[in-house]
Amino acid sequence: MAEISVADIRKLRELTGAGMSDVKKALVDNAGDFEKAKSWLREKGKAQVAKRAARSAANGLVESYLHRTDPQLPPTLGVLVELRCETDFVAKTEDFKQLARDLAQHIAAADPLYVTAEQIPNEVLEAERKIYEAAAREEGKPEQAIAKIVEGRVNGYVKSSVLLDQPWVKDGKVTIRALLDQAGASLGEKIEVGRFSRFNIRQA
């Protein structure tokens, strides 16, 4: 059996966000092969996410964040976010509370409009399509390319407007969806954003 070092376990855990016991088992079961262990964890993670998706997230907390442009002035931007989990035990953990704080600060900075793409009204998407189509024609794009250009821009609108599809402001390589999946894998529960509100005096 290949010798598994503490450094290997630590490195794989940092790369995947998986728990210590899962990381060790992945390395042992794959004879210390790093790439195979990563694939094993990815497959295991997918299975765990699928199982968690069927469970109910009936606990959690509401986190708030207030932003001041000047420490001497009252806050002009505020966020409330509802972060849900399955048990009050997880809701009380510092990791869960920190995740809620990170999400509230992300929402303040990134200004999403919806939690999921399914929440975007059809009329909003149709209005965006018309705007992008008119813009593409004004730009003189070839007629046969306009439909593809419009869909690409609509997809860009969705990614920028939907919280789960946005890149995390603290790490642009990770989406909020992936961040929640990592937290769910680490905490062993279904983690989801229920809803959020963002208030900005300057946009009122």
Swiss-Prot record:
Supply one GO molecular-function term. translation elongation factor activity
Cellular compartments per GO CC: cytoplasm
| Involved in Mg(2+) ion dislocation from EF-Tu, as annotated region | 87-90
Gene3D superfamilies for this protein = 1.10.286.20, DNA helicase RuvA subunit, C-terminal domain (1.10.8.10), Elongation factor Ts, dimerisation domain (3.30.479.20)
Q: Which UniProt keywords apply?
A: Cytoplasm, Elongation factor, Protein biosynthesis
Q: Which CDD domains is this protein grouped with?
A: UBA_EF-Ts
Family to which this protein belongs = Belongs to the EF-Ts family.
Biological role stated in the UniProt entry: Associates with the EF-Tu.GDP complex and induces the exchange of GDP to GTP. It remains bound to the aminoacyl-tRNA.EF-Tu.GTP complex up to the GTP hydrolysis stage on the ribosome.
Q: What is this protein called?
A: Elongation factor Ts
